[in-house]
Amino acid sequence: MSHELAATPVERVKRALADCGLDPNLVRELPADTSTAEAAARAVDAPLGSIVKSLVFLVYGATEGIPGAPAERTPLLVLVSGDQRADVHRLRAALGLSKKRLRIAQPAEVLDSTGFEVGGVPPIGHWATVRTLIDRTLSRFDVVWAAAGSPNAVFPIAYSRLVTIANGEAIDLVEEF
């Protein structure tokens, strides 16, 4: 097992932050649960909207539905504001995908795709490169709080810096009420 694979999820996030030129000590491991946006907002005493919700989707490739062909699956990370809901129809339209080609990942698939468990999926430090879409509603806040690899670890970051370190694509993805 490589040194990278042996690192804990939080250590991987700290290493990824350092690789981006950020202080790994930004990561706060808290006694409180931060696995939901509401819990994270309470734990860091921040507005709900400043919490980054991480949603992992699976995009199915062109072989989907062809008898005998393996289903190609590519993970897609979608980051939205804690006080918003991702609009799957809008997401599909932005990606030019049919309903059959995009679905939310199950917890085991999230772990397999990113190396992190649901409730702790960060914007960086994944096993492999994951395409990342970041909703623009997060830009309302000077500082946003992202998961740091476990259900009780988070880190603060400016929205623009989040887009940069995640190699993310800023896009409008939330439901309009």
For the regions a language model picked out, list residue spans one by one.
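Extended, low-hydrophobicity, polar/charged segments
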Residues: M1-F177
